[in-house]
């Protein structure tokens, strides 16, 4: 399954659509004013399906990933000197790659690819693609990608 989003994606108090490869809206993301970043994810029918919330009283950036009312995992930035590194606390997932260039991979505990994230260059505006192996993981992958970008945006 592939999910696509356009350049204007990460605007904190705006809403934007996440598309499938046929440009059908799959999710809608809405930024919410809160202490720290907070994004609510809705399915195409308008039902809230997930939330990405920044934990504010932490030394390094950390985000809570929730499905409905239940916290299912965390992603945090690790201390590193040159390249950003992140730690995912969910199903044994790991993330590695070049986060600054939007080219990274999420793998499971056995090293198998869960998803890859890349920047598409053949579009009029910057378009980002999530290539997700199992459609059942689409919401989870999207929420972790949103958290990584939230951390990147807060540095700029």
Q: Where are the model-predicted features located?
A:
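Intrinsically disordered, low-complexity proline/glycine-rich segments
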Residues: 1-156
